[in-house]
């Protein structure tokens, strides 16, 4: 298996388990080395430049362990599980919308250099765009309210991808889908899952326009919680999700 396929498989694996208790660095057994000390000095460790770009999920908000969320765990796993010598840069900023991420990609010289050097990139985007629409139209929300904003978001996502490819034409990009924590903050929005599904469909359809750009869905893992129970119900008086950060009921916690 070549490096590209290994990287692709590993990214999908860890991001799919992003919000479950089966963190790979705890459950994947590590085979004991059969190399002698002399042999190990002869093995050149392959290098990998991992770039994480996005919003609070990339920054690691909600991870009370202080490790930095899924991106840091993924970077560590490249080393621990596959022996890569990893260069890891994290450009996640909490609250960033797609417009703000694109602006940073144009204006941040450090990010521009990181894009040129990266071997693989993850992107978390879209959740704050959706939240902005909810807050702006809160008194008059309908599923159709999100149609135009979703399309506009999709166009901005394409601009982000094109910007990354301008700097690095063959860069594999993994775009993480959004999930539905809104039933905890806005339990009256019972159609919110339909909106989140549509938002993810928009993201996935845009990624399919590019070779080497992949959509990674995470909604089912987060929306249903640790026990796999549906998050939205008629009785919204007591709703909880043990994969979300208790302080805001929005971001994944360290288990998530």
Where are these regions (language model features)?
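Structural recognition of the beta-strand scaffold that forms the well-ordered cores
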Residues: 49-52, 87-92, 119-124, 172-177, ...
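Short, flexible, mixed-charge acidic loops at enzyme active sites
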Residues: 127, 131-140, 227-243
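Oxyanion-hole/transition-state-stabilizing segment in secreted/luminal serine hydrolases
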Residues: 103-148
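Surface-exposed cleft-lining segments at the edges of enzyme active sites
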Residues: 93-99, 130, 137-152, 184-192
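Serine-esterase "nucleophile elbow" of acetyl-processing enzymes
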Residues: 28-92, 112-113
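Histidine-centered active-site loop/cap adjacent to the catalytic His
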Residues: 240-256
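Substrate-gating cap/lid alpha-helix
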Residues: 181-220
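Hydrophobic membrane-insertion alpha-helices, especially the h-region
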Residues: 8-25
């Amino acid at each position: 298996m070549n490096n590209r396929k290994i990287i692709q498989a590993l990214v999908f694996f860890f991001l799919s388990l992003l919000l479950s208790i089966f963190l790979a660095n705890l459950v994947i057994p590590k085979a004991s080395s059969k190399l002698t000390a002399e042999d190990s000095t002869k093995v050149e460790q392959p290098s990998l430049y991992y770039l994480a770009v996005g919003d609070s999920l990339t920054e690691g908000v909600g991870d009370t362990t202080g490790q930095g969320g899924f991106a840091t765990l993924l970077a560590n796993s490249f080393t621990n599980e596959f022996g890569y010598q990893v260069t890891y840069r994290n450009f996640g900023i909490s609250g960033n919308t797609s417009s703000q991420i694109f602006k940073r990609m144009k204006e941040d010289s450090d990010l521009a250099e990181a894009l040129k050097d990266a071997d693989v990139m993850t992107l978390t985007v879209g959740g704050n765009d959706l939240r902005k629409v909810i807050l702006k139209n809160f008194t008059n929300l309908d599923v159709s309210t999100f149609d135009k904003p979703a399309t506009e978001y999709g166009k901005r996502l394409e601009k982000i991808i094109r910007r990354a490819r301008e700097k690095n034409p063959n860069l594999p990009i993994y775009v993480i889908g959004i999930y539905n924590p809104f039933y905890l903050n806005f339990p009256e929005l019972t159609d919110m899952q339909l909106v989140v599904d549509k938002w993810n469909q928009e993201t996935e359809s845009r990624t399919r326009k590019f070779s080497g750009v992949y959509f990674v869905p995470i909604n089912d893992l987060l929306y249903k919680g640790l026990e796999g129970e549906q998050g939205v119900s008629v009785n919204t008086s007591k709703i909880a999700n043990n994969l979300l950060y208790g302080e805001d009921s929005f971001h994944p916690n360290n288990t998530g």
